């Protein structure tokens, strides 16, 4: 009797789109298997009236899903990598990281068509301290206003709540098929202006360490280059013990055999932004070295001050 594979997913449109994309990829390689999605509501989905940095803790969008894995009510889970804490629940592993979508953030404008057209004092919607800090460094005149909800909810709020612009991950728009939407006024934010979050644009497929059949299956959709880059980023995040309450960014690229990684830590208003970068062959070493460079520049002081607020 063939095994039915139960896939854990948050119930947002984006999460379900991502989970179905993974299932369709696996069906190409394993047509004999049946797949079924089990929708799971997480703490981050339930708490919508405060920013994630104020909720605190790690794994706000994954803890309940990981519990379902441990309880064996699902066989694997599909996460946005940037939501996955640097340390997984015991007994769980990341079984595959498919090829990364765009890692960039992007502006979605209300009236104008470009960042340079936004007037003094424009109201920008983002609940990400990472985005806010880097944007305020570039444009301290901006007023940052928190915005929560799924990607479609935030797009509705752009007009309903009179934001001049909101910031979204480009990967989410791409996976929803909305980059081709001619009614959206979009502009990519280059990493020089806003370095992406660790793992941004990548998916994490998490499973039980002991489930060899699922692990073998997931290997078929793993993308080696993405995995190497994300490894550097996540080692960096773990070294700094980062979470959503700290403006931390990290982005790696690979060319030939070399990994280039840039990391950043800042304070909430962008008045202090510390940066470091390294290039080398070993992604773990590179991630660690960049974290150590930032700690030597005073990142630990910034992190501690933000945690004590």
UniProtKB/Swiss-Prot annotation:
SUPFAM superfamilies: Periplasmic binding protein-like II (SSF53850), Porphobilinogen deaminase (hydroxymethylbilane synthase), C-terminal domain (SSF54782)
CDD domains: PBP2_EcHMBS_like
Pathway where it operates: Porphyrin-containing compound metabolism; protoporphyrin-IX biosynthesis; coproporphyrinogen-III from 5-aminolevulinate: step 2/4
UniProt KW Amino-acid biosynthesis keyword: no
Catalytic reaction(s) noted: 4 porphobilinogen + H2O = hydroxymethylbilane + 4 NH4(+)
Cofactor note: Binds 1 dipyrromethane group covalently.
Residues bearing PTM S-(dipyrrolylmethanemethyl)cysteine: 244
Entry keyword set: Porphyrin biosynthesis, Transferase
Single GO cellular component term: cytoplasm
Gene Ontology terms, MF aspect: hydroxymethylbilane synthase activity
GO BP terms: protoporphyrinogen IX biosynthetic process
Cofactor(s) the protein needs: dipyrromethane
Enzyme class: transferase
EC number(s) given by UniProt: 2.5.1.61
Database matches in PROSITE patterns: PORPHOBILINOGEN_DEAM
Note: The porphobilinogen subunits are added to the dipyrromethane group.
Family membership: Belongs to the HMBS family.
Role, per record: Tetrapolymerization of the monopyrrole PBG into the hydroxymethylbilane pre-uroporphyrinogen in several discrete steps.
Assembly mode: Monomer.
Record-given protein name: Porphobilinogen deaminase
Taxonomic placement: Bacteria, Bacillati, Bacillota, Bacilli, Bacillales
